A protein has these predicted regions:
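Donor-sugar nucleotide-binding helix/loop cap in glycosyltransferases
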Residues: 1-259
């Protein structure tokens, strides 16, 4: 699901299922079959349905480094002990997943972010797959069905029917909540702030063209300002970068961190 160079993004292991498996194993180490019967609803799904869903979800947990299996017995990795909520899980998963630039989920996200404006004109996921293929990334249709569940959860946008609206607000907000590089009230030059963002979120790097920020990053910065998390400054004597075009001024020279 998340491995470098392995095209195995599938729709079954949605975030809530992977989280449920992790939380059960955190409290109850055990054999694979016993864990499956404990976390799956046998009276709702057929045995084969449960097996596919569970196996993919368990594999995703292992690939994220949260669960380990030895001789068919599964237990919690140390990283799982600090995950006590879906927010904890989201922050950990985003950090792990986007460390892997050769994984299919990273490549789809990066390319979608780079060509975000084009992606918004499509009304079917098949069109998105075809378009990304035209930009050099070939992958099976089934992969986009898995991707569409994970990327909004990781904080990179909002799912609206058959389109993912690119907005990295949640992902950036998660980073700001735990960062120690900037002090409250500090006015940070936009160049420094973007370099920090791109180091933490390498999936957005290709969306920027010199000093022109891409749609997903621009949406995130505007949302952060609207939520009172940052203030976008326009100092006349400073180097100006540009947010993705919108009504009013799109120039920005500094980002002030909220107190």
């Amino acid at each position: 699901m998340f491995k470098n160079g392995v095209d195995t993004v599938v729709p079954e292991p949605i975030p809530s299922r992977v989280y449920a498996v992790c939380q059960y194993i955190k409290k109850h180490r055990g054999q694979k079959q016993d864990i499956m019967h404990a976390v799956c609803m046998d009276d709702v799904f057929t045995a084969s349905d449960n097996s596919d869903i569970f196996n993919h979800s368990l594999n995703a947990a292992v690939e994220l480094g949260l669960v380990k299996g030895v001789d068919n017995e599964y237990s919690a990795e140390e990283a799982l002990l600090g995950i006590n909520s879906m927010v904890d899980f989201r922050r950990y998963a985003a950090n792990e997943i986007f460390k892997r630039p050769e994984s299919l989920i990273f490549k789809i996200t990066s390319l979608y972010c780079e060509y975000a404006e084009e992606m918004l004109q499509y009304t079917k996921w098949e069109q998105v797959v075809e378009s990304l293929g035209n930009h050099g990334l070939q992958f099976p249709y089934n992969a986009i069905l898995g991707w569409r569940f994970w990327v909004p959860f990781l904080g990179c946008g909002y799912l609206n029917d058959t389109v993912m609206l690119p907005n990295w607000y949640v992902r950036f907000d998660d980073l700001l909540a735990s960062q120690k590089e900037f002090k409250p009230g500090q006015m940070v030059p936009i160049k420094d702030f973007v370099e920090w963002i791109e180091a933490k979120c390498p999936e957005v790097r290709k969306s920027r063209k010199e000093t022109q920020l891409g749609l997903g990053v621009s949406n995130a910065l505007r949302t952060l300002e609207a939520m009172g998390k940052v203030k976008l400054e326009r100092q006349p004597d400073s180097l100006q970068w540009q947010l993705y075009r919108f009504e009013g001024s799109n120039d920005i020279s500094h980002v002030t961190i909220a107190r």
